[in-house]
């Protein structure tokens, strides 16, 4: 089954930017585009506006206008639209589950808006079973020009980042872009090592060679699967969020992972993804992984 790329529309400038980003990505990947608008009836004092059918018509007209702006630029793109009356989070999560990715709009720095206002957005990102991409209102196609990289974070063992790396390499292959794979590392507490083990580490050149070996191992299968995608291995000491943000200016897209499991307090986005979402200027993809 071919999964579409789905854009969530709410009438804001941010969601229109997300719609056009999703359309360009669908063209690159040869996938259909689905546009979903969630609608809630809002009673007004005016008699005609109080009619649910009237309001639904307004929503449909706005959706059709937005889609026309897409098909004018991409006349061969297969586009489907849905106006759904229902609960926003559940509707978006259901749409994401059937999609290659869900694309939503967000403001630049600071709190996310539109679909991503407060708890709604946090819940969609935290619970989606497919990648969610957030696009800034000011994002333009020029930002995807040659020279800009797909930046992805890699942590832990090779299997820990497999889904995140797959998304990054597939995206870079579709765009003809370079992948910059960032692995951040920190010094462990000294008390975790005996003097003898520290001596052996010093003889081996310190901890960095071990981190470099782990990064190379994680990338090996993806280099083999995507031999035409240029790769930059970026190894740097520091917190993962800070290191990723330090190279955000190079990125046409940043890709971060999120553990797809629930804790005692519910699903969580994670501190690294949360920091990148709020402070990176480029579009950000959050990819769930085991």
Region locations from a protein language model:
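Short beta-strand elements of ligand-binding domains
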Residues: 103-106, 132-137, 284-288
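Structural beta-alpha unit
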Residues: 1, 14, 53, 69-102, ...
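A short acidic, glycine-rich active-site loop
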Residues: 52-62, 200-211
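Protein-protein interaction modules outside structured cores
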Residues: 209, 232-246, 250-290
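Glycine-rich, Arg-bearing micro-motifs that act as flexible, cationic patches
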Residues: 104-123, 145-147, 253-278
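General small-molecule cofactor/ligand-binding pocket signal
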Residues: 34-36, 80-84, 133, 180-182, ...
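Small/aliphatic-rich secondary-structure junction motif
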Residues: 1-49, 148-202, 223-226, 230-231, ...
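Short, structured interface segments
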Residues: 121-141
């Amino acid at each position: 089954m071919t999964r579409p790329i789905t854009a969530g529309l709410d009438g804001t400038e941010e969601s229109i930017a997300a719609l056009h980003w999703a359309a360009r990505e669908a063209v690159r990947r040869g996938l259909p585009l689905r546009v979903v608008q969630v609608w809630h009836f809002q009673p007004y004092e005016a008699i005609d506006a109080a009619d649910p059918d009237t309001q639904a018509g307004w929503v449909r007209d706005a959706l059709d206008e937005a889609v026309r702006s897409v098909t004018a630029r991409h006349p061969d793109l297969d586009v489907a639209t849905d106006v759904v009356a229902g609960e926003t989070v559940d509707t978006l999560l259901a749409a994401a589950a059937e999609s290659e990715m869900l694309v939503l709009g967000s403001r630049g720095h600071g709190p996310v808006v539109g679909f991503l206002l407060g708890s709604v957005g946090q819940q969609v990102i935290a619970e989606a079973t497919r990648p969610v991409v957030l696009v800034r209102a000011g994002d333009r196609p020029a930002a995807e020009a040659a020279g800009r990289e797909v930046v992805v974070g890699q942590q832990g063992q090779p299997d820990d980042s497999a889904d995140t790396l797959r998304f990054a390499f597939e995206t870079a292959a579709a765009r003809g872009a370079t992948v910059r794979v960032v692995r951040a590392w920190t010094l462990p507490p000294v008390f975790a090592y005996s003097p003898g083990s520290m001596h052996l580490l010093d003889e081996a050149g310190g901890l960095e060679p071990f981190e470099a070996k782990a990064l190379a191992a994680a990338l090996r299968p993806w280099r083999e699967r995507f031999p035409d995608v240029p790769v930059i291995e970026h190894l740097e000491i520091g917190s993962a969020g800070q290191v990723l943000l330090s190279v955000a200016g190079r990125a046409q897209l940043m890709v971060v992972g999120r553990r797809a499991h629930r804790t005692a307090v519910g699903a969580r986005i994670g501190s690294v993804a949360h920091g990148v979402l709020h402070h990176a200027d480029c579009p950000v993809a959050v990819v769930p992984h085991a």
